[in-house]
Amino acid sequence: MTLTAYLLILTAYLLGSICSAIIFCRLAGLPDPRQNGSHNPGATNVLRNGGKLAAIGVLLFDTLKGSLPVLIAFRCDLSPSAIGLIGLAACLGHIFPIFFQFRGGKGVATAFGVFFSISIIASTTMICAWLIVFLLTRFSSLSAVIMALTAPFYIWCFKPEFTFPVALICCLLIYRHHDNIQRLWRGQEERLWDKLKSK
């Protein structure tokens, strides 16, 4: 790989390490998402804690963390493997942020930003699948897991050269949702819609 690729991998990790959920909650006077709700510093938990505008900000910021480094990598005409590693680095930064004691979120929005920059068509299909599962079940976690399971197939259909790095990112997402998967299996997972209606 080139020096540009290595620099972008480092930049993507550091950008991913900026935990927007903590920052937006502090600015909005909301409780630390790591200490409330699901204890996950992500947009869904910020929404659970009552910060609708903050949640939108977190969602957009986290998506851009994945999207921007990959777009820059495309502009630099890097190889698919290098671009994939840059996207993976952004997700690793979000999940294991160096600026926040390596306690980060689950990486769904950041991963989606990566997928969006790789293929708009594939990522649009993914978000449609996410919405269908969410509307049917009201489980945000299940929607994310289904998206992670199907994303490599969608990428393979439209940008097959990125299938392997996308599959690596999806394995990371599923790993980060292992607690949610266990709660879903036991019937103990909380529906996002029910939580919002109770506020």
Curated annotation (Swiss-Prot):
EC category name: transferase
Pfam families, per database record: G3P_acyltransf
Family as reported in the entry's similarity comment: Belongs to the PlsY family.
Lineage: Bacteria, Pseudomonadati, Pseudomonadota, Gammaproteobacteria, Pasteurellales
GO CC list: plasma membrane
Coiled-coil ranges (or none): none
Keyword Transferase: yes
Organism: Haemophilus ducreyi (strain 35000HP / ATCC 700724)
Listed pathway(s): Lipid metabolism; phospholipid metabolism
Name of the protein in its database record: Glycerol-3-phosphate acyltransferase
Database matches in InterPro entries: G3P_acylTferase_PlsY (IPR003811)
This protein's UniProt keywords: Cell inner membrane, Cell membrane, Lipid biosynthesis, Lipid metabolism, Membrane, Phospholipid biosynthesis, Phospholipid metabolism, Transferase, Transmembrane, Transmembrane helix
GN (gene name): plsY
